[in-house]
Amino acid sequence: MQYFERQNDSLIFRLNGETVMVSPWGKDSLRTRAALFNELSDNSPALLSPAKSEPVIELGERQAVITNGKIHAVLSLQDWGDELQISYYNQKGELLLQEIPNGGALFLKARRFQSLPGDSFFLTASFLSNPSEKIYGMGQYQQETLNLKGCNLELAHRNSQASIPFYVSSLGYGFLWNNAAVGDVHFGTNTTQWTARSCKQLDYWITAGDTPAEIEEAYANATGKSPMMPEYGLGFWQCKLRYYNQEQVLSIAREYKKRNIPLDVIVIDFYHWPYCGDWRFDEEFFPDPAAMIKELQELGVETMVSIWPAVDFRSENYEEMKQQNMLVKSNSGVDVQMIFHGNNAFMDATNPKTRRYVWEKCKQNYADLGIRTFWLDVAEPEYTSYDFENYRYYSGTVLETGNIYPREYARLFYEGQKENGQDDIVNLIRCAWAGSQRYGALVWSGDIMSTYEDFRKQICAGIHMGLSGIPWWTTDIGGFHNGVAADPDFKELLIRWFQFGTFCPVMRLHGSRQPYTPIYNKAGELREGTGTDNEVWSYGEEAYQIMTKFIHVRELMRDYTRSLMQQAHENGHPVLRALFYEFPSDPICWDIKNSYLFGSDLLVAPICHEHAVDRQVYLPAGASWTDARTGVVYEGGQWITANAPMDTLPVFLRDGRQDYLIGEI
């Protein structure tokens, strides 16, 4: 009996109602799909169409092999039960990944389809686990964990959690779960198990590479690359919750200019609008936004405005959007997805009609005034109740397609801006999924707490996001929640975080600083309040001197930072990199979670423990390392104790590169 066949460039297996297809998908890469009682779909949630490949396919009676460059898949019928097992190898014949066997009398299934109402399935895909394997990427989870081996991760978005189902393995491969369904992944010591709570087919992509950088380049080619970061993305961004009127925005920008402190972007936060979903300035608080934006441009400052996907039932656009089916639907109950200053539904970013409609509003009320960059907040979106099974998008149920929402939100603005004649595009966004990078998504890590614990988590998050194919990433410097401006301990945390932020892809000061002041309109109605001052001069002279010094350092690095953005644009390389990204042959580098590389040349060791004035730093083997503070040179492959009084940050120059920084930090 013939189980295997070649169909064009793909290897096909059929048995017992299941169809499995393995196809070449880019250099050294394969895409595997499987369906039960259904035809395979060519639709891909994340992958772009690949360049033409010439695979080698070998067909046998009970085994077949497909080879594409450095990777080959072996499809074997097991002797017990006629279950198919798929194994992936590199060009050296080393096993990369293998489905679980059927276990003989256990009758296990590596690809398990459990029927749901309609034509969907609850899908489980199980692979054998190599105990020595280390796993990195998967997006952004709020945990102080670098090696994800042993972790259970929810494949769903929440405020400060961005699920991007791609990982880089220490065994020399990258794996993308090409499925936008809500689910879970368990990187166990015995098996790795992926679940999708509702889907039509199994779909994943795997690539082999000799280095993490090679794997990352393959992933960028498969899912897209970031645009080139505009020049105003390279410097310092000022933000707070919230500048609530026009004069306040202008006074802050004027003060930066007066003090001769470089400022690239100032951000106007939420509720500058009358109601969510109006997507325009409230004329009472912003009477002449065009004049405001013009003056900011004359000061050399870009204006960024906050956008929310929420549409208040009182919004001037709500009834039309409801009538035109441009809002997210609830499967049961009322269509209220967020309760915040009233009842709100979310605009459906997966609907092309919605994307066109919302962009036209934002073009008319923002872009036509001169605004070129947007802050796409609440991008998960942030349901008041995360009952994923109760919501439905144009693209399908949230259980089946929900994770694409933040990418389509980014797409809405990117495509609108491109049509409007804008080339280099960056929009700040609170979440992402596979492919978001190609739509100019600069992800920040969400509404995190102002604590050292959360600070440490962000270092891991930044490393993982870079390895997940998102080179543009940042945080709220100082954290978002519960930072009391007058508290000396918070000031210390802010300074240490500010130093870290200098060496992030984008340097942005933000937070909801306490105490909080209520704001009322002329009619006496309560509006969204404002936190206390959050500018670099707001925290006393010592903090001011340190923070302005580090803004100066950021400016000194502008050419270098621009070159890193060029690498991200052309090759998909992260800006913030794990040590092992540049030094994969040094085994210690695979475990360092509290230091990182800013590009290839700068090793950054944040001070992320309260009252610490020194720390241990590992310097990777294979290079010499110059202390940017003192000029002292160390050989790699050793641990050192780096002193770090409050006004300095341990930064080391690889082989003496970027030596203009010596004595500046």
Region locations from a protein language model:
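Active-site-proximal helices and loops of the catalytic beta/alpha 8
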Residues: 74-75, 270-273, 280, 284-339, ...
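Aromatic-lined carbohydrate-binding/catalytic grooves of carbohydrate-active enzymes
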Residues: 227-391, 437
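The substrate-binding groove and active-site-proximal loops of carbohydrate-active enzymes
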Residues: 204-208, 233-246, 273-287, 339-359, ...
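N-terminal accessory segment at the very beginning of proteins
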Residues: 1-233, 239-241, 246-254, 265, ...
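Catalytic core of carbohydrate-active enzymes
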Residues: 414-416, 420-425, 432-444, 465-475, ...
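Conserved, mostly hydrophobic/aromatic
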Residues: 22, 70, 166, 256, ...
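Short, glycine-/Ser/Thr-/acidic-enriched flexible segments
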Residues: 37, 171-173, 180-182, 211, ...
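Beta-sheet entry/capping signal
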Residues: 29, 72, 165-166, 172-175, ...
